[in-house]
Amino acid sequence: MPKSIGTIARFTLATFALLFFGWSAPSLAQTTEPKLEYFMTYKALLEPAYKIDDTLYIVNVLPGGWAKGPNISGTFIPPGGDWLRVMPSGAFRLDVRVTLKTEEGDLLYLTYNGIIEHTEASLAKQKAGEKYTHEDLTYFVTAPTIQTASKKYAFLNRVQLINKFVEARRSREDSYVMYDVFIVR
């Protein structure tokens, strides 16, 4: 049998086998979905930002503020800070570390990164010292993890959280950020 006829025969046989035995391409459809469970809302008090250069701002988190949820209540204690980097796209990338002291006296160390995509309106409100909300922004989501020695809150060492921005204000008299926090299941 000439080589070209053998090649055609093998190709035909392979094609028939694939069709007969039900070969299909891998599916690209979604196979799972994260579930979010509300954990708490918190308001962190902030000092005005220190501008290092056009791409880096540092914000100290002040003592006080609050965190409240169905099974948690507490306030922020020092140390705490937020390093904001302006990316080439104009988006802000957060790098945050804060300490939360619960009403039971337990310490929770939160660290998170995230992305802020401002609009002209949100930047104008921020510059004017006005409150801006999630409706003013294109995108503002962060992903905290928590470390603690607390028995009550030990489960937080084993879960990923998501912060969804609620509102903020940046002024000399009243600077804060507020988030709703969810456990990803």
Predicted regions and their residues:
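Sec/Tat signal peptide C-region and signal peptidase I cleavage site
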Residues: 25-29
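Bacterial N-terminal signal peptides that target proteins for export
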Residues: 1-13
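Bacterial N-terminal signal peptides
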Residues: 12-23
